Regions:
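Active-site hotspot residues in diverse enzymes, especially metal/ion-binding acidic/histidine motifs
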Residues: 1-192
Length: 192
């Protein structure tokens, strides 16, 4: 499931947002400490963000974590819901689990901090709505999922510091998953 973003973003724009995200929490190392930043992000935005670690059975198949918006009294409150097993594995340093959590944090940064939420449509009756888009049916730069995935990649594997690294160096120094590091080398570092 995907939504069309209200603003399209290029890889270079996302890279700048990643630098801003890291700077917001004074992260100067190659390693992005996802679990520490999760706590810092929740503390910094405690009036609109919290996270919840929940039973694995409470999630649909294939969902590891998700950002949920609850609106009460015209006020938005966001919750990063995290599978218990994903949270436990992230605490142990599992790169994939850290990536799942970071991805949801990136959705929050894009939607709440930068205001890049789903594109709003208004029908002839004046009713506003968003459209659920089939995966891969949008140009990447307009996909909210791609934007969050790209931002997560840029935050966890900083391009300028890792562009000349080997797969092993990236995994070791960034604590990202092997799959994420392979994607970076094949699709990001190679094409820049």
């Amino acid at each position: 499931m995907d939504y069309e973003a209200s603003v399209g973003l290029s890889r270079k724009q996302i890279r700048l947002i990643a630098k801003y995200f890291r700077k917001m929490f004074e992260i100067k190392t190659i390693l992005f400490p996802v679990m520490t930043v999760l706590e810092l992000l929740v503390n910094k935005f405690s009036n609109v963000l919290y996270y919840s670690v929940e039973d694995d059975d409470d999630f649909e198949y294939g969902v590891m974590a998700t950002l949920v918006e609850n609106i009460e009294d015209n006020e938005s409150m966001y919750c990063i819901r995290i599978k218990n097993s994903v949270y436990d594995d992230a605490i142990k340093g599992d790169g994939a689990s850290l990536g799942f959590i970071c991805h949801e944090m990136c959705h929050f940064v894009l939607i709440h901090i930068l205001g890049i939420g789903p594109k709003i449509y208004i029908n002839t009756n004046g009713i506003a709505y968003t459209r659920v888009i089939e995966p891969r049916s949008l140009p990447l730069f307009k996909s909210m999922e791609w934007q969050a995935k790209a931002l997560c990649g840029e935050v966890m594997i900083p391009y300028e510091k890792c562009k000349d690294h080997t797969l092993e160096q990236i995994v070791k120094e960034t604590n990202s998953s092997v799959e994420q590091a392979k994607f970076f080398l094949k699709n990001v570092a190679k094409n820049e």
